Every structure is written in structure tokens, then in C-alpha cells.
UniProtKB/Swiss-Prot annotation:
Binding site for ATP: 169-176
Gene encoding the protein: atpA
EC class: translocase
Protein name stated in the entry: ATP synthase subunit alpha
Biological source species: Lachnoclostridium phytofermentans (strain ATCC 700394 / DSM 18823 / ISDg) (Clostridium phytofermentans)
Cysteine pairs bridged by disulfides in the record: none
Top-level taxon: Bacteria
InterPro entries: ATP_synth_asu-like_sf, ATP_synth_asu_C, ATP_synth_asu_C_sf, ATP_synth_F1_a_nt-bd_dom, ATP_synth_F1_asu, ATPase_a/bsu_AS, ATPase_F1/V1/A1_a/bsu_N, ATPase_F1/V1/A1_a/bsu_N_sf
Catalysed reactions listed for this entry: ATP + H2O + 4 H(+)(in) = ADP + phosphate + 5 H(+)(out)
Amino acid sequence: MNLRPEEISSVIKEQIKNYSMQLEVSDVGTVIQVADGIARIHGLENAMQGELLEFPGDVYGMVLNLEEDNVGAVLLGDMKNINEGDTVKTTGRVVEVPVGDALLGRVVNALGQPIDGKGPIETKKYRQIERVASGVIARKSVDTPLQTGIKAIDSMVPIGRGQRELIIGDKQTGKTAIAIDTIINQKGQNVKCIYVAIGQKASTVANIVKTLEEYGALDYTTVVASTASELAPLQYIAPYSGCAIGEEWMESGQDVLVIYDDLTKHAAAYRTLSLLLKRPPGREAYPGDVFYLHSRLLERAARLNDELGGGSLTALPIIETQAGDVSAYIPTNVISITDGQIYLETDMFNAGFRPAVNAGLSVSRVGGSAQIKAMKKIAGPIRIELAQYRELAAFAQFGSDLDADTKEKLAQGERIREILKQPQYKPMPVEYQVIIIFAATKKYLLDIEVSKIRSFEKELFEFIDTKYPEIPASIRDKKVMDEECEKALITAIENFKKEFTN
């Protein structure tokens, strides 16, 4: 064998030339205990709260507890292959999710990874899931309506862009239905939607995605799903991920709607984590910072000022109550954080009054500034007339000899209740809401039988569309009900009534 020294020396010289004295420093620790999705790690003196940790086998964890002699971390993946004695590295990063228009029409998990089988998400932009909410100076007051397409909400508890409105009610009262209808109603309104499913059955989420697809709403919607079968840490970070995806659009001057369905399960997932991390339990076994858990999430909803692009992020958190108990711990917390609540009642729902919005307990703390002028002008009496109806209906059960005035108030209340009923997945454009509410509040429905109100409404819209198309067009474009428009509407209703009663 012929050795050539000059060749060997040139290779060695080349390697010496390329040698660099760069050290790769990483803080490492050792797993001392792993169970229930929680790992305790010895070492990692420089770990930060919320930092990502790298475990063997491409599993990541997140630091939640910094104790004297160890670090408590939650695992964001399968813990099967993690054992005591394994080496863990810090990454110097916190949890990030992909953001941008590539996420529209997609279903992702809490880490932003696609789970809809439509291939990878083409985006180079990432955002940290936790962020300090915009300050007072960065915001401006809510003044643009976000139409839900639901008459009972848009007339009595209007929602503005940048508001946080809680949807609260028992199981099976139509909470998710209101949220989905609101998403469907944003078609063509230039609002991007994010639906965050926390701790729900995978089949339920699949049905929601299918519904959104059917109504053409998935094109402007991102679904972030952390189902009941997933680990508690993923359910815990899901709403923050959804919020981060929305903030990217908000900061580029767009309007975003985020639905958190629901925060009761989110709080339960956080309680699970906290108890496993041996944090001291408080009321209802929730940890002491469960208020901060939701306040730091919902406070990120905002309407930015014009210098920052004037974008908005509207939040509709959902809370599930037990037997209508609004004064439990989590419901009272979220009620105090949000700018109003839509309270859904089981009795109304079972009586066929759907959406089952209780007008007495539902409020919007933004109010009239989140309505178009036309709606503000005509929807005022509805709440009072409904309240009078409820009060009188209770008395009317006892006595039959009622005076004419009382009978009229009862009849008027019944008709208003009837026009507020609405089928699911049929949101109504605001101009048509204004027309039917105008007809009801101006007492044009008093001589129509209650059973015929729904068909009256349907046929009235058809009549106006064919003979007076300028009325809805005027309300839609000008957003006000001027004298001319009001006169035309009165004429249209009176002409239609002659046809309808004949």
C-alpha cells in the first residue's frame, strides 16, 4: 500500500484551517420524575417561566414551575419514550405558532400544526402565543358594529368590533350555534374568524368544520382544535394560540373575530395542570391565578387606534354553567372581565324560543355605539316591551278580566317574542332586521295572528325585494332610517298587509 505523505498533510492542513473555536453552550438538566404529562427536572438553573424545553425523541415541554431544586414542566407531546435520567435542554424560546393568511380554511392543533390532512402550512412567520395586551394609548373606543345576524342580539345586546362579549348558559342551550351563526354572517364583511375548540369531542369539531364548509365560511376561518383526547397542556395553550393568530391580522389593520369554546373546559385543564404541579388549590380547587389565566387572554381583544392601523380583535368567550348558576367561580370571573354577556336560558330553549337569549339578564356594556343608527333608532322599545310582557304575563295567569291596555301590551309582547325567533344557520342581514323590528315596534303586527308572524315576515321581505328594493338598499348603504325611507317603509308595510290579510 503506497502512502503519500503530502496528500495526508494537505488534508490535515485543510481541516486545521476550517477548525473554529465555537462552543455550543446549552443549559442541560436531568429528568427526575415523569408522570401524567408532567416532568420534574433537576438542573436547568437558567430556565425561564414559559420557556420551551427539548426532551429526547423530538418531544417539547414548557416550563411552568420554577422551584428551589427542580423545574416543573408540562409535556406538549407523547411521554411514552421519556424516562428518568434523560437529558433535557433549554431552547431559549417560548411556544410559537405559525401565523398569516396561509392558515385560512385550515384546521390546526394548539401548536399550529395542521390536522386536516391538507398538507403543510406555507408560512415563514411565527408569533409567540403569550403577549402583553395593547395599552390604553394604543386603543380607541369601540364604534363599529360586528353584526351577528341574530335579531335578538343585534337589536338588544349589540356587539362592536374590539369588544369582548360572553356567551353563557347551560349545556344544550345553543351557545355554539350562536357563535357559528356569527361566523357565517361575516361572509363578505371583511372579518377573519378563528374558532378555538377546547376540550370538545373530535366528532363535534368535525361537524362544525363541515357546517362552516357547507356555508362557505371556512374560506375566511381558522379552526384551532384541542380535543378532549389531547393532553391538558395543549388544551391550556389552545386559546392563546388562537389569539396570537388573530393578533397578526389585527396588527395589519384587519378585523378579526375569535371564539373560545369554551373557557370552562380551559379552566378545568389549567386546574389539572396546577394540581399535578402541586400548586396550592383555592376555591373549587382552582389555583389562585385562574382569574389571571382568563384576564390576560381576553384583555388582548382590542380596537387599535388609527396610527396602528385601526384593526380590531373581537372575542366571544363561551362559558357553560351548571343548572343556571351564574354565580359560580369561573362564570363570575369571566363576567367581570368581559364587556357584557349573552345569557341563554334552558327553559326558553325547551319552550321553542330559539335563540334562547334572556333579554333581562343579557347586556352589552358598549351598547348603542355598536349599532347602526337605523337599528338604534327603532330597537329602543323592544327591551322595555319585552320586560312589560314578562311582568304582565305572570299576572295574566291568575285573572281573565284584563283591561284593553293590558291586553294590547300582552299581544305586542307576544309578537315581539315571535319575531325574535330564528332558525339555526340563517343569520339575517341588518337591513332586513331593521324592517321587521320597525313593523313590530310600530304595532303593525297587532292584527296578525301569532302563528302567522313567521310567514308574514318571510313574505314581507319577498314583497319588499320585488316592489321596493330601494328600502333595504338605502338602510344598508346609508345606515340610517331617514324620513323618506321611513315613509316608503310604512307605505310598503301597509300595502303588503292588504295583500296578506286578503
